[in-house]
């Protein structure tokens, strides 16, 4: 089985990739999207979103990182794919699945699912532009509204020469509703097409992963949101590990405080750790108590101080029980 840590715009940056690949056996990571409009972006944009380019396009633990591009103009997508490759990208991933309204309004992401011919043009332009040894992949949803549209979309991508395709098994209109997941369509795609597939959507534990593999016939899986709910989800899905216990999550939150973004004026950790709590609270009820203590702070120092104090009290309670 292969497990990929998927992209999450505004959430899964290089620091989170570093942390999550240190504690999980992921096979691949994909960056947040590089938004392409009508120019070749300056190098600092690629390095900001993928600083791993300066260390062999891999995380510090050695997991390959592919650069994700989002746009609808074939020429400029290809030109930026070339630049990413020149900067050392191990792979180029094309985003045709982002459901965000602002992205779709500007004709990016999932909006292109309504235009398979344009998807074909973008993929072909990028595939023709970069060296053959650099894979060009794509990520889609099943369609804008009708999942039956997936076959025309996949045909457009495969015929354009893409090396791999991730399928999020919901339509754009299906959002993130569990009831809208349609893994069976990935199986239908696998039966009709030869392009290698990665299955994505509603994989929250080992059992989900196994059911997805059984339903789709695909043994490459991508996890995204769940990786923030339970930090060791990659190992749960791949190796049937038990969920990380809450005390270890607290240690991870403290470890996260050691990272800081250059030039962010000390706001990185407070903003991102609160964002992380929004996910943790869905899987760890204990997170609610700790979040209430830190939510009004906007500096890293008092947040870390409170988390450390909470950890010490937690360890004290655990030792008394033992």
Curated annotation (Swiss-Prot):
<feature type="binding site">
    <location>
        <position position="68"/>
    </location>
    <ligand>
        <name>FMN</name>
    </ligand>
</feature>
<dbReference type="GO" id="GO:0102262">
    <property type="term" value="F:tRNA-dihydrouridine16 synthase activity"/>
</dbReference>
<feature type="binding site">
    <location>
        <begin position="224"/>
        <end position="225"/>
    </location>
    <ligand>
        <name>FMN</name>
    </ligand>
</feature>
<keyword id="KW-0819">tRNA processing</keyword>
<keyword id="KW-0560">Oxidoreductase</keyword>
<feature type="site" description="Interacts with tRNA; defines subfamily-specific binding signature">
    <location>
        <position position="274"/>
    </location>
</feature>
<dbReference type="InterPro" id="IPR035587">
    <property type="entry name" value="DUS-like_FMN-bd"/>
</dbReference>
<dbReference type="GO" id="GO:0000049">
    <property type="term" value="F:tRNA binding"/>
</dbReference>
<feature type="binding site">
    <location>
        <begin position="7"/>
        <end position="9"/>
    </location>
    <ligand>
        <name>FMN</name>
    </ligand>
</feature>
<dbReference type="Pfam" id="PF01207">
    <property type="entry name" value="Dus"/>
</dbReference>
<dbReference type="InterPro" id="IPR032886">
    <property type="entry name" value="DusC"/>
</dbReference>
<keyword id="KW-0820">tRNA-binding</keyword>
<dbReference type="InterPro" id="IPR042270">
    <property type="entry name" value="DusC_C"/>
</dbReference>
<dbReference type="InterPro" id="IPR013785">
    <property type="entry name" value="Aldolase_TIM"/>
</dbReference>
<feature type="site" description="Interacts with tRNA; defines subfamily-specific binding signature">
    <location>
        <position position="272"/>
    </location>
</feature>
<feature type="site" description="Interacts with tRNA">
    <location>
        <position position="176"/>
    </location>
</feature>
<feature type="site" description="Interacts with tRNA; defines subfamily-specific binding signature">
    <location>
        <position position="295"/>
    </location>
</feature>
<dbReference type="InterPro" id="IPR001269">
    <property type="entry name" value="DUS_fam"/>
</dbReference>
<keyword id="KW-0521">NADP</keyword>
<feature type="binding site">
    <location>
        <position position="139"/>
    </location>
    <ligand>
        <name>FMN</name>
    </ligand>
</feature>
<feature type="site" description="Interacts with tRNA">
    <location>
        <position position="95"/>
    </location>
</feature>
<dbReference type="GO" id="GO:0010181">
    <property type="term" value="F:FMN binding"/>
</dbReference>
<keyword id="KW-0285">Flavoprotein</keyword>
<comment type="similarity">
    <text>Belongs to the Dus family. DusC subfamily.</text>
</comment>
<feature type="site" description="Interacts with tRNA; defines subfamily-specific binding signature">
    <location>
        <position position="35"/>
    </location>
</feature>
<keyword id="KW-0694">RNA-binding</keyword>
<feature type="binding site">
    <location>
        <begin position="200"/>
        <end position="202"/>
    </location>
    <ligand>
        <name>FMN</name>
    </ligand>
</feature>
<keyword id="KW-0288">FMN</keyword>
<protein>
    <recommendedName>
        <fullName>tRNA-dihydrouridine(16) synthase</fullName>
        <ecNumber>1.3.1.-</ecNumber>
    </recommendedName>
</protein>
<dbReference type="GO" id="GO:0050660">
    <property type="term" value="F:flavin adenine dinucleotide binding"/>
</dbReference>
<feature type="site" description="Interacts with tRNA">
    <location>
        <position position="279"/>
    </location>
</feature>
<comment type="function">
    <text>Catalyzes the synthesis of 5,6-dihydrouridine (D), a modified base found in the D-loop of most tRNAs, via the reduction of the C5-C6 double bond in target uridines. Specifically modifies U16 in tRNAs.</text>
</comment>
<dbReference type="InterPro" id="IPR018517">
    <property type="entry name" value="tRNA_hU_synthase_CS"/>
</dbReference>
<feature type="active site" description="Proton donor">
    <location>
        <position position="98"/>
    </location>
</feature>
């Amino acid at each position: 089985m292969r497990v990929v840590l998927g992209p999450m715009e505004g959430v899964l940056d290089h620091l989170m990739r570093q942390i999550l690949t240190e504690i999980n056996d992921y096979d691949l990571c994909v960056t947040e999207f590089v938004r392409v409009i009508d120019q070749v972006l300056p190098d600092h944009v690629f390095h900001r979103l993928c600083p791993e380019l300066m260390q062999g396009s891999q995380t510090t633990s050695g997991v390959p990182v592919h650069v994700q591009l989002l746009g609808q103009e074939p020429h400029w997508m290809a030109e930026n794919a070339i630049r990413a490759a020149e900067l050392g990208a191990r792979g180029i991933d094309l985003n045709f699945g982002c459901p965000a309204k602002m992205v779709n309004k500007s004709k990016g992401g999932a909006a292109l699912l309504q235009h398979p011919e344009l998807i074909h043009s973008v993929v072909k332009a990028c595939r023709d532009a970069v060296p053959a040894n650099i894979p060009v992949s794509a990520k889609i949803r099943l369609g804008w509204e009708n999942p039956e549209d997936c076959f025309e979309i996949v045909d457009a991508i495969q015929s354009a020469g893409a090396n791999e395709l991730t399928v999020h098994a919901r339509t754009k209109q299906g959002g993130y509703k569990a009831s809208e997941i349609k893994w069976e369509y990935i199986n239908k795609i696998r039966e009709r097409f030869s392009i290698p597939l990665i299955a994505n959507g509603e994989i929250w534990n080992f059992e989900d992963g196994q059911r997805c593999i059984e339903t789709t016939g695909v043994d490459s899986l991508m996890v995204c949101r769940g990786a923030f709910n339970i930090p060791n989800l990659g190992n749960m899905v791949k190796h049937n590990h038990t969920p990380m216990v809450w005390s270890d999550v607290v240690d991870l939150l403290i470890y996260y405080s050691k990272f800081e973004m250059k030039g962010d004026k000390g706001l990185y950790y407070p903003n991102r750790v609160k964002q992380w709590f929004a996910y943790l609270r869905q899987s760890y009820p204990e997170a609610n108590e700790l979040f209430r203590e830190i939510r009004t702070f906007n500096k890293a120092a008092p947040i870390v101080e409170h988390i450390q104090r909470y950890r010490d009290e937690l360890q004290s309670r655990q030792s008394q029980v033992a």
